């Protein structure tokens, strides 16, 4: 397989905290899938949860080479974890259409955070 695209994104956690303080759960409802929203509502560190999901989804859109345009939305990407905690991306709707068009066979996702930032890297292969 060949690398078809790569995307990375970094999010300042304090910025996400400020958005949530101003608008409550509006950000969560805008970017999270129903499954992610359920996880967010039960998470011990909800601000970090959203920051990492946002970074992952932005990185995924960049890896497709499009960013968020032509109908692609943050909720078209979903982050899940396997039994060891490794993150994986699921794609739907426009994200899936674009992945099929590009002949994407696999997605690789890495997410990390520290005191002030969350970062994600996505590599797509086909």
Curated annotation (Swiss-Prot):
One of its GO terms (molecular function) is holo-[acyl-carrier-protein] synthase activity. Its cofactor is Mg(2+). Keywords: Cytoplasm, Fatty acid biosynthesis, Fatty acid metabolism, Lipid biosynthesis, Lipid metabolism, Magnesium, Metal-binding, Transferase. It is an enzyme of class 2 (transferase). This is Holo-[acyl-carrier-protein] synthase. The keyword Transmembrane does not apply. It comes from Hamiltonella defensa subsp. Acyrthosiphon pisum (strain 5AT). Belongs to the P-Pant transferase superfamily. AcpS family. Its EC number is 2.7.8.7. Mg(2+) binds at residues 9, 58. Transfers the 4'-phosphopantetheine moiety from coenzyme A to a Ser of acyl-carrier-protein. GO terms for cellular component: cytoplasm. It catalyses: apo-[ACP] + CoA = holo-[ACP] + adenosine 3',5'-bisphosphate + H(+). GO terms for biological process: fatty acid biosynthetic process. It is found in: Cytoplasm. The keyword Lipid biosynthesis applies. It holds the Pfam family ACPS.
């Amino acid at each position: 397989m060949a690398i078809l695209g790569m995307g990375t994104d970094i999010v300042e956690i304090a910025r996400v905290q400020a958005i949530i303080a101003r608008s409550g759960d509006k950000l969560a409802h805008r970017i999270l899938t129903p499954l992610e929203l359920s996880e967010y509502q039960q998470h011990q560190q909800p601000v970090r949860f959203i920051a990492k999901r946002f970074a992952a989804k932005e990185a995924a859109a960049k890896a497709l080479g499009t960013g968020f345009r032509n109908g692609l939305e943050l909720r078209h990407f979903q982050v899940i974890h396997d039994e060891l905690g490794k993150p994986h991306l699921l794609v739907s709707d426009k994200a899936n259409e674009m992945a099929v068009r590009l002949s994407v066979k696999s997605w690789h996702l890495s997410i990390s955070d520290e005191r002030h930032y969350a970062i994600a890297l996505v590599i797509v292969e086909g």
